[in-house]
Structures are given as structure tokens and as C-alpha cells.
Amino acid sequence: MSRPHGIPLPSARRSSDSNETESAFDDDKQGQPRPREGVRQLTGAERVRTLVESNASVSLTLPGARDCRAFDEFGTGMPVARTVTPDGDVILLVSGESAAARAAAHAQDDDLTAVIEITDVAPVSVPHRIRGRARLTGWLTPVRGDDRPACAALLAERRPAAGLPAPDGPPEPPYAVSPAWTMLRLEVGEITLDDLWGAEHVEPEALAAAEPDPMAAHETELLQHLYAAHGDRLGTLCGLVGARGAEHLTAVPLALDRLGLRIRFTGGAAGPFDARFDFPEPVADICGLRRAVHTLFSAAAH
């Protein structure tokens, strides 16, 4: 087995290609470090799927729609749960009294354009804390008829405490008698992603085929634990990237997935920089992740 090492991730530069999607994290805007070509990473579709299935902050907006109760433009607030169907549609659990629920019920079979925006924030305090944003645009409809039990089961699996009815509950329209919640379906037409790895467009078909990263459910807890209890050991990882003046740097765990751990080093004269530490092999569960992190620490100690 080869000795683990870190891969420094230099800051991005604005692309000279006018057709390339501009990043919200360009150097002159955010100073967000970016990767070199060839670094092991999840695909864009996997990263979007992971964000959709995560607890990251989300907003649902109906561009140009107007609430029949208040004659101004509205956003709908935050869905309390969300998941993705095998066909790639996004199922949202929202308040039955929300503007989105009322608008979808009123639209019937008309196209109702909607936008989901997901903002991913690092769970530890670090410069440039926003790790990424995903934007999914499509058409919003109520979940009706025979689709309701299957969608309710998917949401219940994602958020068991969300107060969903049994999957075999009554299939009548969810907007009768002002229920506490309702399910909406977003048929995705366009996806854009801007995160630590770069800015790109993702095809809706790729989202349907992708799986969320298995470490996403554990990432927040593990990063916070590493930061609080193992800050000194994280600092030793700087030796694996050959950085000068390592004794003056502070190491903050920024992100992890099944392929590796990303550390942001701060306090240097040149400003913060990131390093990516690949695991010897992809990890599938928490036990494998602990072994992989231990391997990194052991390599840094020798």
C-alpha cells in the first residue's frame, strides 16, 4: 500500500472560455480554493444527489408567482423533507398552508415553474464557509393518486419523524380540509452546481442514476469531532503536503466523502489553502471511515 499524501488544491482562476459557467467562488469574489485536474472526486450528479438528500439549507421559489392572499411575489420557505424518486423527480414535503401547496393545487395541469436552491455550509467555523450551492429548476405538481403511497414511503425513509401518514393511507387529494402537510413533485429540467470542485451543469438523467454519498449522514458529526478533539493531529497532516511554516498553520476539517478528506489550512502568509487527502480505498461505512482517517494520521506521524 502506498503512503498517503495530501494534494494541495490551488485557488481558481477565472476561465478565459466565455462559454464556461462562471463560478460563484472565483478568486476575486470568495477566495475559495479549487482542485487540480485528476483529483479523485464524486461526480457532479453524485454531489447534487447528496445535497438533495442531505440536511443542507433549502429554499423553494416560484418565479413570478403571486400569492392570492398577498398581492406580492412570494417565496415558499423551506420544505421539511425531500428525496429523489427512481425517475429523478424531487419529492418535497411542505406545509399544506404554504404558498407552494396552494399554487400547485390552483395550477392543476398547467406548468408551474419552480426553483429549488440548496446551500451547503461547512459544519465548523472556517473562512469561506459556504461549500457549495445547487440550483434545480423544473415544474411543480401535487403528488396524486397511486403515486402518493410510494412517495410517502420514500419521504418516511428519509425523515421518519416528519409526521407522514402510513404508506397505505387514503389517496384523496392532499389539499382537502387544510392538512398539516402535502407532497409536491418537482420534475427537474435543469441543474447547476457550484461547489468546492467547480461550477458545472448536471443532466437530470444523471441525477436519477446517481446515488448519494454514503458518508453524508455522518459528515457533520465526524468533522465536528475531528475539529474539537483532534486538532493537533489534523495539524500534522500538513507535513503530507510539504507546506512550509506548518507550525504556524491551523488545520480545519472542511469536507469528507467516501473518497477522501479535505482540510483547509489557515494562518499562512499566503492565505488559506486546501489539501485533499485521498483514502486508500473508497469507504462504505463509519468503521471503514475511521480506519481510513487513522491511516492518514499514522502516515503523518512517521
For each of these PLM feature ranges, what is it?
Residues D87-G88, G96-A162, G271-D274:
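Short, structured beta-strand-loop surface elements
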Residues S57-S59, R133-T137, M183-R185:
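Conserved hydrophobic/aromatic beta-strand scaffold that supports enzyme active sites
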Residues R49-V52, R82, A105-Q108, V126-P127, ...:
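A general structural signal for short secondary-structure junctions and capping/turn motifs
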Residues N55-V58, D87-D89, D111-T113, A180-M183, ...:
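Short, surface-exposed beta-edge/turn micro-motifs
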Residues V94-G96, I118-D120, L140, R185-E190, ...:
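Short, structured patches in soluble enzyme cores that scaffold and shape functional sites
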Residues T76, V121-A122, R258-L261:
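Short amphipathic beta-strand starts and helix->beta connectors
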Residues M1-G31, C151-H302:
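C-terminal edge-of-domain segments
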Residues R3-P8, D27-A104:
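An N-terminal domain-cap segment
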